[in-house]
């Protein structure tokens, strides 16, 4: 039987409890593995003798390996290709930003350089969004909570990660229990990520949204809306047929009432599909009763997998102006990052590139995570 990841919390907790070993040693083990990913269990000091026996027989420090790390030409994006225990591959992306750029309320921002990690929750995806390369893979498998956390472990060796966004491969809310457990690990010792620095993105899995705040309070929710009318959503997001827009908006209203937090609305800009001014007005009317931040995302090419084209800059700016000036909705335009390594939004699809050398970050960008929500 395959050995389990030490970061699969429910597994290691159950084994420790069954063996009568205090679970307070688990974060100690995690900290050592983060600092020494190739360690032997006997190298961890001060564990009970029974813990060493259990770890050797049931667990490995990491079940995955970092296969390649490809850096964008501008040095701000690194795409990680990670090989899983059963031979599948998944991807994660490190994006580097400077939170000091720009102003907030007319004042210079505080902060500095830091990195956001875009994490995958599945290999492939069931949702089949027409503008997303991952959907072309179909669904392969769910990641375990340990495999999700291990992406953070691998990335932390390359950059100091402060923010995590579940916007990589897969639909996070379709792997709900592993998602919840992984985030509980990330926000505890020794990672100590703030829940407010974690964003979960979904196409709109209504039954999961209904319980999300109870299981993961204080995280950020992002919804891939992409159209303000159901027929266009279904055209570009086939899975939307299972989640009617009116029911989705009801679920978001209930979520916001409970969480008292703004919601990110993701809206990919597709030329001639969802970018005209009438749709901007429809989106504004749909969202004006909510506290939201709309993030307009220029479409990133995915080669022969799609015939879509990105909206031109004038259309994107006009769309933003309509939402912001007429409906008072805070609207940002996502900066395109990592296109040259297929690490941008919608471009994640497993391939096996040649390894490229890692460099240092010289250019930095502002991030939607710096919006005060």
Give, region by region, the residue ranges found by the protein language model:
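Auxiliary Fe-S-binding modules of radical SAM enzymes
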Residues: 1-90, 96-99, 103-107, 113, ...
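Short linear Ser/Thr-Pro motifs
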Residues: 72-73, 120-121, 201, 224, ...
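Short beta-strand motif preference
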Residues: 80, 92, 119, 221-223
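Residue-level structural signal for beta-strand termini and adjacent loop
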Residues: 94-95, 178
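Canonical Radical SAM [4Fe-4S] cluster-binding loop centered on the CxxxCxxC motif
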Residues: 98-103, 109-146, 159
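Glycine- and other small-residue-rich loops at beta-strand/loop junctions that grip anionic moieties
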Residues: 141, 198-201, 334
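Cys/His-clustered metal-coordination modules, chiefly Zn-binding fingers
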Residues: 150
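Conserved AdoMet/S-adenosylmethionine-binding subsite of the radical SAM
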Residues: 155-163, 168-326
